[in-house]
């Protein structure tokens, strides 16, 4: 991804679901205008999720996701289907390609998508080789209670209808979230304290920093940045105290102890807790840390899949803070990327990263799973602020 690209996590996620050989790959190629997905007459050609980023006029940046057929068979087929079901968790809008035999699989998928409150656009593909498209569409409408769009991905017929349907199904709140919310307005002075993150390549900033700076510039704020060691010197160089200080959560305590009394304090992780998830639930759940004992079990979830580093916040620093508070025998499990247990009942607490690499839908899906099992869930920044005794002083 270049510096001018929209991160995939900020794009509208549009997933294509259907049986094997229903034309999902052909449709995604027609929609994107590129040979993004491999097309074959052999059922089951798509064996993993295939994604393609593009812009749709009137909608903006999108990410199309091609999924394996939900009627796959055998042990390997079950694995492919599980990946298809995982894709639902990150889907903002679903394109459901209907077959021409029974509709049991389609109805099951439709029910699952509706249960997750995901807008669905049913599609009847291959009308260029069907003689009964209209009657089949009527039958599908009777079975699924929603009329499909008639298209031919091969001939690119009806593609514009799909784009229009996506626009009409666009969630009203999509893209309306703000990283900094109402914390700052035009002309406010904002100081960003950014330790040199060894996970970021030389000469680069990590994604939350880039996105936050861009939003502050869009709000016409006055933006100043510094590293932790230059924080005191930066304050002295400023004509007035910052309205807001945004820091890396790892140095929360250091910055809190040195900040001007009138400056408000938050962190990138805390801001992303609200931007991607449910900040109020995270703050409420942080109190569960007090109830932990050495026999408790905690799950730490990291969106990134980078190789562990010596001072990794999720694998080293946060566990150290927790065990220092609770005891060395506290059991802590770590998952990364798309790995996330279905059964969370063994855990007394889930702590998630800021999820800059996940879209909001995916994070909210995880929160929903956790809440359904009555497990408290918080966030790196919120947890660190709580462990440092300053959560009530942090703004979000």
Predicted regions and their residues:
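G-domain G4 guanine-recognition motif of GTPases
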Residues: 67, 97-101, 118-134, 149-158, ...
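Short, flexible loop segments at the rims of nucleotide/cofactor-binding pockets, characterized by
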Residues: 41, 70-76, 98-101, 169-171, ...
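Conserved hydrophobic helix-helix packing surfaces used for dimerization/oligomerization
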Residues: 14, 190, 296-298
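Conserved G1/Walker A P-loop phosphate-binding module
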Residues: 1-78, 82, 86-89
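Long, well-ordered amphipathic alpha-helical subdomains in the mid-to-C-terminal portions
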Residues: 183-209
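Conserved C-terminal guanine-recognition region of P-loop GTPase G domains, centered on the G4
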Residues: 52-60, 75-148, 178-182, 205-221, ...
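Canonical P-loop GTPase G-domain recognition
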Residues: 115-121, 126-182, 189-191, 220-229, ...
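C-terminal effector/interaction modules appended to NTPase cores
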Residues: 1-2, 19-25, 203-396
């Amino acid at each position: 991804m270049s510096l001018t690209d929209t991160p995939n996590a900020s794009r509208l996620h549009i997933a294509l679901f259907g049986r094997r050989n229903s034309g999902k790959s052909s449709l995604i190629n027609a929609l994107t205008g590129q040979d993004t997905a491999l097309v074959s007459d052999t059922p089951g050609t798509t064996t993993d999720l295939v994604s393609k980023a593009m812009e749709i006029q009137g909608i903006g940046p999108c990410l199309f996701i091609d999924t394996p057929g939900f009627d796959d068979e055998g042990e390997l087929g079950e694995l492919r289907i599980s990946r298809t079901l995982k894709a639902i968790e990150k889907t903002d809008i679903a394109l459901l390609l209907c077959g021409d035999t029974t509709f049991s699989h389609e109805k099951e998928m439709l029910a699952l998508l509706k249960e997750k409150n995901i807008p669905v656009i049913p599609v009847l593909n291959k009308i260029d080789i069907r003689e009964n498209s209209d009657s089949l569409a009527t039958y599908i409408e009777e079975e699924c209670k929603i009329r499909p769009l008639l298209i031919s991905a091969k001939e690119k017929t009806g593609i514009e209808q799909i784009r229009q349907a996506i626009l009409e199904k666009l969630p009203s709140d999509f893209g309306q979230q703000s990283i900094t919310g109402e914390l700052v307005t035009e002309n406010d002075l904002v100081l960003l304290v950014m330790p040199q993150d060894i996970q970021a390549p030389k000469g680069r900033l990590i994604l939350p920093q880039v996105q936050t700076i861009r939003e502050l510039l869009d709000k016409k704020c006055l933006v100043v940045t510094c590293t932790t060691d230059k924080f005191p010197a930066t304050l002295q160089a400023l004509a007035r105290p910052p309205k807001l200080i945004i820091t890396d959560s790892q140095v929360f305590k250091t910055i809190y102890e040195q900040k001007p009394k009138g400056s408000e304090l938050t962190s990138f992780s805390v801001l992303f807790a609200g931007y991607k998830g449910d900040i109020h639930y995270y703050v409420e759940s942080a109190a569960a840390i007090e109830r932990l004992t050495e026999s408790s079990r905690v799950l730490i979830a990291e969106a990134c899949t980078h190789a562990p580093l010596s001072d990794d916040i999720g694998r080293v620093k946060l566990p150290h803070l927790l065990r220092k508070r609770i005891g060395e025998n506290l059991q802590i499990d770590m998952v990364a990327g798309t790995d996330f247990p279905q059964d969370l009942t063994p855990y007394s607490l889930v702590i998630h990263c800021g999820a800059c690499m996940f879209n909001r839908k995916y994070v909210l899906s995880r929160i929903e799973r956790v809440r359904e099992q009555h497990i408290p869930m918080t966030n790196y920044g919120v947890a660190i602020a709580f462990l440092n005794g300053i959560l009530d002083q942090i703004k979000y």
